[in-house]
């Protein structure tokens, strides 16, 4: 038997990418460039049944929330989704979903849906034409007032949205429903923002503020419910679960999470929900009951800055003996994930083996972050003489490619996303582990057998100034007066870690920290810009609690109870509200600690869901 230890590192340099990394690259990118990148993604990474328009629309809406320009979002959205009046892109979304979930509309229902798409396009186009006429009275016939057009279109939306909620096809039509809801909520937001220019009364503006609150709530709850029902019914291999989740997050929940931020303006959304990709190695079947553990395993160290991974691998060749075929077998025995500051994860895989590979970015990972992975595995047979059991384990930064084993199969990449963590699973995970999700930053070795599949965690998070001495992120505030968000899971440190968990959310631009013990303190570190902001915390406190916030030596307190006083969205057990903590200053050119302490008044269920620094001159729309 001949054993080959793969101690080398395969690297490929892409010279065209050797540029200084821009922590606000997404904000500086044109919509035309974004559209081209999603089309190229579809052309080269075709394994996922996702129409590229869904990624473009998500990016477009994020840019609009982060901008003060372009109040007429509805007109731009029409040109994106219905170019030249065509419904082809919406039909492409439907066909992709039919392929993905293996369900088709019957002929009559398909006819109804296509008619509704055509009607939606015509209604939006007519409204935009009427607004153009109203704003250009010297060129076109002028309507006496735009309010009639506004109210008419709102009623048309309310009559058309139910046509994408047909009984028996809720999951299949969910991506189309989400796009139709994008139109309706963008329209409502536009009415509020354009009220002065359009001559809309204060009373009508109040009505449409109420509409924005109500329909964000109703549409969000509708999207969450069929997804959760479908996910709970899964009993699949890990790649199937992750693919289903990624598909629905790109097609639906990217939008749902943005809707909750439509009340803000000029707010840079600096991170979002994770997208996951895995290899296809043999593992046990998992159910939704196992998901809380898997979820915790994949992002238990999401607040650290990824630097690479190390472990043990072998490629073994069994020679032709007694007429048996030559057999090549590649095995990843164990892996540890490494972060800046000398921090490493627990071991995934076999124990008591010597490390024989170490992959790192070579350069500062803030300048050359990981962006792409190859994680597939399979078996090749060359007649009856040779059989090869191969694994792929390759990772690409913006500069170089590194391999545990050579890159093969489909790559995992999403435009404007970065690989912010790596994890993995063994062939069989113990029931004891599956029943006990990892707490925040927990170090727990998983498995006693070889790694069956690695998992890469993709996130939009990019505005990282530097790393704290413990290896965690320092969040960079924009240079201008744009507001920004910080994900609660990207903390510098949290005390009471053993009773702090990451909780999955669908309508929140990422996940929450769930505190199960009173008086935890979560610290975040910001690189300030000297600007003053209104600090909002999105929290779910089902029961009474007191929040104490400390920044720049000032202390702010707020008593909260969101049991009934909330936005109306039930997001995986959370009922949230955005709490205005007060006016804070992000001191310039220094690292600013932000401490958030929570005291329970009784026994509430408490989750910290988002941290938002909102420009003081742009209060929320409701």
Swiss-Prot record:
Keyword set, alphabetical order: Sporulation, Toxin, Virulence
Domain of life: Bacteria
Gene Ontology MF: a single term: toxin activity
Pfam families noted in UniProt: Endotoxin_C (PF03944), Endotoxin_mid (PF09131), Endotoxin_N (PF03945)
Sequence similarity: Belongs to the delta endotoxin family.
General function of this protein: Promotes colloidosmotic lysis by binding to the midgut epithelial cells of lepidopteran larvae. Has low activity on dipteran larvae.
Protein name, per record: Pesticidal crystal protein Cry2Ac
Species the sequence originates in: Bacillus thuringiensis
UniProt gene name: cry2Ac
């Amino acid at each position: 038997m001949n054993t080959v230890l793969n101690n080398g590192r395969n690297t490929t340099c892409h010279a065209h990418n050797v540029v200084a990394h821009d922590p606000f690259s997404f904000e500086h990118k044109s919509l035309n460039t974004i559209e081209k990148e999603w089309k190229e993604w579809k052309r080269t990474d075709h394994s996922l049944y996702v129409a590229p328009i869904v990624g473009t629309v998500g990016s477009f809406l994020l840019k609009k929330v982060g901008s003060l320009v372009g109040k007429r979002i509805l007109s731009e959205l029409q040109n994106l989704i219905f170019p030249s009046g065509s419904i082809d892109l919406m039909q492409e979304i439907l066909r992709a979903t039919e392929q993905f979930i293996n369900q088709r509309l019957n002929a009559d229902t398909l006819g109804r849906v296509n008619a509704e798409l055509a009607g939606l396009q015509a209604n939006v186009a007519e409204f935009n034409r009427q607004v153009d006429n109203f704003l250009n009275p010297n060129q076109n016939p002028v309507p006496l007032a735009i309010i009639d057009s506004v109210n008419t279109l709102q009623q048309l939306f309310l009559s058309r949205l139910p046509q994408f909620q047909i009984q028996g096809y809720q999951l299949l039509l969910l991506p189309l429903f989400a796009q139709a809801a994008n139109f309706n909520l963008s329209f409502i937001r536009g009415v509020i923002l354009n009220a002065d220019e359009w001559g809309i009364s204060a009373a009508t503006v109040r009505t449409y503020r109420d509409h924005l609150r109500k329909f964000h709530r109703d549409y969000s709850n509708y999207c969450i419910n069929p997804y959760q029902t479908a996910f709970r019914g899964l009993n699949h291999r890990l790649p199937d679960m992750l693919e289903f989740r990624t598909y629905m997050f790109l097609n639906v929940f990217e939008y749902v999470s943005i809707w909750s931020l439509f009340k803000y303006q000029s707010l840079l959304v600096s991170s979002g929900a994770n997208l996951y990709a895995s290899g296809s190695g043999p593992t046990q079947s998992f159910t939704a009951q196992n998901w809380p553990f898997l979820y915790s395993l994949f992002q238990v160290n999401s607040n650290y800055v990824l630097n690479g991974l190390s472990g043990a691998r072998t490629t073994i060749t069994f020679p032709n003996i007694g007429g048996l075929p030559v057999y090549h077998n590649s095995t990843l025995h164990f892996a540890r994930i490494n972060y800046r500051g000398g921090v490493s994860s627990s071991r995934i895989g076999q124990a008591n083996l010597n490390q024989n590979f170490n992959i790192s970015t070579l350069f500062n990972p803030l300048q050359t972050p990981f962006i792409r992975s190859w994680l597939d595995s399979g078996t090749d047979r060359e007649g009856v003489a040779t059989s090869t059991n191969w694994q792929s384990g390759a990772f690409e930064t913006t500069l170089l490619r590194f391999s545990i084993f050579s890159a093969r199969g489909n790559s995992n990449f999403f435009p404007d996303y970065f690989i912010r963590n790596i994890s993995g699973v063994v062939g069989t995970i113990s029931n004891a582990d599956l029943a006990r999700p990892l707490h925040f930053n927990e170090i727990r070795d998983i498995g006693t057998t070889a790694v069956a599949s690695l998992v890469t965690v993709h996130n939009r998070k990019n505005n990282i100034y530097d790393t704290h001495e413990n290896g965690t992120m320092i969040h960079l505030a924009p240079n201008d007066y744009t507001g920004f968000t910080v994900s609660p899971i990207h903390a510098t440190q949290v005390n009471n870690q053993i009773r702090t968990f990451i909780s999955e959310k669908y309508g929140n631009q990422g996940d929450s920290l769930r505190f199960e013990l009173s008086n935890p303190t979560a610290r975040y570190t910001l690189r300030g810009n000297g600007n003053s902001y209104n600090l909002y915390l999105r929290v779910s406190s089902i029961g009474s609690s007191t929040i104490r916030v400390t920044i720049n030596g000032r202390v702010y307190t707020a008593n909260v109870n969101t049991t009934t006083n909330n936005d109306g969205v039930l997001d995986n057990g959370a009922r949230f509200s955005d709490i205005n903590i007060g006016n804070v200053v992000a001191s310039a050119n220094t690292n600013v600690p932000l401490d958030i302490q929570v005291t329970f008044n009784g026994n509430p269920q408490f989750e910290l869901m988002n941290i938002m620094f909102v420009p003081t001159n742009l209060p929320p729309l409701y």
